[in-house]
């Protein structure tokens, strides 16, 4: 069984909410911070409480490495400890690293994020340099069932600068990327009909949602853009297949939910936000 199979089963069991642990120190409630601890140690305490509170309603977690790299060595220890906490909770974890290099460098990235202190179940990758920026990760998919989510059509406003440019044959650049990755993924199929090579498909540009889902039925989607970035449940639902086939990420909306729920502890508020998000997406899927 591949990690993508396990993610599919996690979504079946708990829903498609992906909790983004893009944890900035400034997000921590002031009365939670222990002055005798480092920023990294406080972030780990915060993350662990969030994981404990939300693991029953989270399909997976996504840990954005930049928030930890910015704190230097203590931040990287916090990153490793956070990945470990998610894995110990028995929930799939995505390392949001967006690597895009080739050859030996990419081999080292793959080793660094699929084994050892920073081991994760999935990584995010950037395909701009070509398929040889993806291939060094594939032995881990083949031998260990590891997975990856490759940037295809993203949720940021600047996506239109490159991804939406049209080719001579009428396709967009994101179509070319998706087509090549979908074809490559045919050799890495899991038991539930999804490849170990997933796609990052932003939930804020919905014009082609139905077409994209129908076109890449073998590809599991990582769908950013929900909540703070403007993505709505009724839009997100169009990228899912009977409520599965993708995970929907929310970071600030969950991490900072306590600011919209006065008097509620941050971990309880995060749980409430996950439940609300899960129910909203399920309702939207039921209307399709």
Regions found by a protein language model. Give the residues of each.
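Conserved anion-binding
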Residues: 97, 101-198
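Conserved N-terminal beta1-alpha1 strand-loop-helix module at the mouth
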Residues: 1-63, 68-81, 85-92, 262, ...
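Active-site-adjacent beta->alpha loops and helix N-cap segments on the catalytic face
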Residues: 70-85, 102-107, 129-142, 204-213, ...
């Amino acid at each position: 069984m591949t990690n993508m199979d396990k993610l599919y089963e996690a979504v079946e069991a708990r829903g498609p909410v992906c909790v983004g642990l893009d944890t900035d120190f400034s997000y921590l409630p002031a009365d939670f911070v222990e002055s005798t601890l480092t920023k990294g140690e406080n972030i780990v305490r915060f993350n662990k409480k969030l994981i404990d509170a939300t693991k029953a309603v989270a399909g997976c977690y996504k840990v954005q490495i930049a928030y930890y790299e910015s704190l230097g060595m203590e931040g990287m220890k916090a990153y490793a400890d956070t990945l470990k906490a998610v894995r110990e909770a028995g929930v799939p974890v995505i390392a949001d690293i967006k690597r895009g290099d080739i050859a030996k460098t990419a081999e080292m990235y793959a080793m660094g994020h699929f084994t050892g202190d920073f081991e994760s179940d999935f990584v995010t990758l950037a395909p701009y340099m070509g398929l040889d920026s993806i291939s060094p990760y594939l032995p881990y998919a083949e031998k260990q069932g590891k997975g990856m989510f490759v940037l295809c059509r993203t949720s940021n406003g600047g996506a239109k600068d490159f991804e939406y440019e049209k080719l001579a044959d009428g396709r967009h650049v994101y179509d070319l990327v998706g087509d090549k990755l979908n074809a490559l993924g045919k050799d890495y199929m899991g038991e539930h009909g999804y490849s170990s090579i997933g796609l990052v498909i932003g939930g804020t540009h919905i014009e082609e949602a139905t077409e994209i889902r129908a076109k890449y039925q073998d590809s599991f989607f990582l769908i950013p853009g929900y909540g703070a970035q403007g993505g709505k449940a009724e839009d997100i639902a169009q990228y899912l297949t009977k409520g599965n086939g993708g995970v929907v990420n929310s970071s600030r909306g969950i991490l900072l939910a306590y600011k919209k729920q006065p008097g509620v502890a941050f971990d309880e508020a995060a749980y409430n936000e996950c439940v609300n998000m899960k129910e909203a997406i399920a309702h939207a899927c039921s209307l399709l």
